[in-house]
Regions:
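Terminal (often C-terminal) interaction modules
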Residues: 1, 5-6, 263-315
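Intrinsic-disorder-associated interaction segments
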Residues: 1, 13-16, 20, 100, ...
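N-terminal regions immediately upstream of nucleotidyltransferase
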Residues: 1-61, 72-92, 96, 313-315
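Charged, low-complexity surface segments at secondary-structure and domain boundaries
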Residues: 9-13, 181-189, 236-238, 273-283
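Catalytic cores of NTP-dependent nucleotidyl/adenyl transfer enzymes across multiple folds
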Residues: 25-28, 93-262, 295
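Residue-level recognition of the N-termini of beta-strands and the immediately preceding loop/turn
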Residues: 42-45, 128-130, 266
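Histidine-centered divalent-metal-coordination microenvironment in nucleic-acid enzymes
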Residues: 45, 51-71, 131-146
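Generic hydrophobic/packing signal
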Residues: 68-74, 111, 115
Length: 315
């Protein structure tokens, strides 16, 4: 038998916000303190991104993602410019006096100065983000020091250029750029049908239930960001279903239909395809595996669940 409506009543809600706003404020205060090494003339903005910003976080959601972006230095994408616009851009720009490499080191050193002590080292940076853990803030935080990423569509002689803004960063020990568009992502997600965000939470909670409570030797290895993008490609006629159980199975039907070409699916920002080979794209086979296992859970709910009264999404 299929998953009952009562289970989706548990799965659709948001998790508690365990202090993300307070954590962001304390990081901003640290970066703005007088002894911070960050260049006084640098234009820096700090904001939340990810599930806490997008209102798709669930009970037990992990670290809060905080972006620290250098806007006075940027990585340009100018392939859309014609030759005249490209020449104007080249003539009007120069190498920055304060580089991204300097900035990200300064952010790391500032956070270490503020939160580390001889007896406690909660600030670490080994991968993409600077991690602040061990109770230094109300919630564990991933801080991403990045620079502005600018996609130019025009650079006129008079007037303002047409630009889409994103963010670009490198892991601490890598050279490959990671590029995404969190503000466009947020705006587009907000403009979707009002059921969109709760549907994302349902699928994230269904994934977590499968991994923790389902009688299976398999698991669902599907990052939350990609689930959010996948559901964004579901038509509004399905998202608007008031019955959450009907909505869930109709989404499975739609996404598993032979009529759908998953290679055409966009990310929420619509700035990049969802599936592909870049470091910000998903593999189609992983999405298909997730859908197959969620379908199995739908079809065999009373046979294979382990009987836990699991109240995901309730704080």
């Amino acid at each position: 038998m299929s998953i009952p409506e009562s289970q989706f009543d548990n799965w659709h809600g948001t998790g508690a916000d365990a202090g993300s706003a307070t954590a962001r404020k304390r990081i901003v205060n640290a970066l703005e303190m007088d002894r911070s090494p960050i260049d006084d003339d640098a234009q820096v903005v700090t904001f939340l991104q990810g599930s806490y910003k997008n209102d798709t976080h669930t009970y037990g959601s992990s670290d809060v993602d905080i972006v620290v972006k250098l806007e006075s230095t940027w990585l340009p994408e100018t392939s859309n410019l014609d030759s005249e616009d490209q020449a104007r851009y080249d003539n009007n720009t120069s190498n920055p006096s304060y580089t991204y490499s300097e900035f990200r080191k300064d952010v790391f050193n500032t956070l270490k100065t503020r939160f580390n002590s001889p007896s406690s080292k909660p600030v670490k940076w080994d991968g993409k983000a600077i991690e602040i853990t061990d109770g230094a803030l109300p919630v564990d935080v991933d801080v991403v020091p990045c620079r502005d990423y600018r996609v130019y569509y025009s650079y006129p002689e008079n007037g303002e250029p047409d630009i889409d803004h994103g963010m670009a960063f490198r892991p601490r020990y890598g050279t490959e750029q990671v590029i995404n568009f969190p503000k466009i992502h947020y705006q587009n997600g907000t403009e979707k049908h009002s059921n969109y965000k709760e549907t994302v939470r349902i699928f994230k909670n269904a994934r977590d239930y499968y991994n923790e409570y389902w009688k299976s030797v398999f698991s669902i290895d599907a990052p939350s960001y990609f689930i959010e993008c996948l559901i964004c490609n579901v038509p509004a006629r399905i998202l608007r279903r008031s019955s959450r159980s009907n909505r869930f199975v109709e989404i499975l039907d739609h996404l598993q239909s032979d009529c759908n070409d998953l290679t055409t699916f966009d990310q929420v920002s619509k700035m990049e395809k969802l599936f592909g080979d870049s470091n910000t794209q998903w593999e189609i086979s992983e999405a298909e595996t997730m859908l197959k296992r969620l379908r199995s859970m739908w079809d065999n709910w009373y046979d294979q669940k382990q009987g836990a009264d699991f109240r995901l999404a309730q704080s």
